[in-house]
Amino acid sequence: SGAQPKAAVVAGMVGVIAEINPKAVEVRHGQKWVDEVYTSLDELIPRIRQASANKEAVSLAYQGNIVDLWERLVTENIHVDLGSDQTSLHNPFAGGYYPVGLSFEEANRMMAEQPELFKEKVYESLRRHVKAINTMAARGMYFFDYGNAFLLESSRAGADILKPNGDFRYPSYVQDIMGPMFFDYGFGPFRWVCTSSDPKDLATTDAIALEVLEEIAKTAPAEIMGQLQDNIHWIREASKNNLVVGSQARILYADA
């Protein structure tokens, strides 16, 4: 979707996102939804180290296979704080997942001409995919499921994705992040759209939201102060990062 690189920059992080489809990379880079594009891991890895050392807020796209990226992060011993996966594994054999070892074009041909072999390649890739993630998690990375059937399809592939009791190794972001941090305290996703399509109207609504949040924060209990400060940061930074695609709209996880 392109939201991940923007989110990383807004949050002040170094975001690294893999995308195998060159057209998708070109579009997002052209829209300025990702800052830099790399086709070589030999060039990307030093850039990650540099950006981390300098504490940059920057998004880096790797035009290539996600498994190659994860495995290289393992061998290079790159520290990763947060990891996730957003491949469309609800549709693993018809374009939702591209297996490691095949180019974008090769995968598309095999998908159409040799579907059973392609399925085998997907499952082989998922086993390698999970192995690399498990290694990174053992080194301290927090990995979460994005609700995209990654855990389910990995289990079907025979990957090491289950705990001894049969539960998945990793939680979903709703279960482990959004629920405890937001929903349990009455915070929910509110959206508004400026039907005038005027950016000035969106700026006005941002200013109103910021004023309300700052007023609430003056007397808010400590257990929700972090959420409020995150929301204040979000509203302040949203317009600076050119997040609008289409309608002049905003989302805010506000306290109902």
Walk through the language-model features, giving the residues of each.
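Structured helix-beta-strand junction loops
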Residues: N54, H79, R139-G140
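Active-site loops and adjacent core secondary-structure elements that bind or stabilize anionic groups
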Residues: H90-A94, P99, E113-A256
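Active-site/ligand-binding-proximal alpha/beta "capping" segment
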Residues: S59-T87, A94
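Short, solvent-exposed amphipathic alpha-helical segments in soluble enzyme
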Residues: V9-A11, V74-I78, A159-L162
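Active-site-proximal structural scaffolding
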Residues: A18, L41, Y62, I66, ...
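Short, glycine-/Ser/Thr-/acidic-enriched flexible segments
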Residues: P22-K23, N65-V67, T87-H90, N148-L151
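Catalytic or ion-translocation cores adjacent to nucleophile or general acid/base/metal-coordination motifs
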Residues: G2-A53, D85-K131, F168-F183
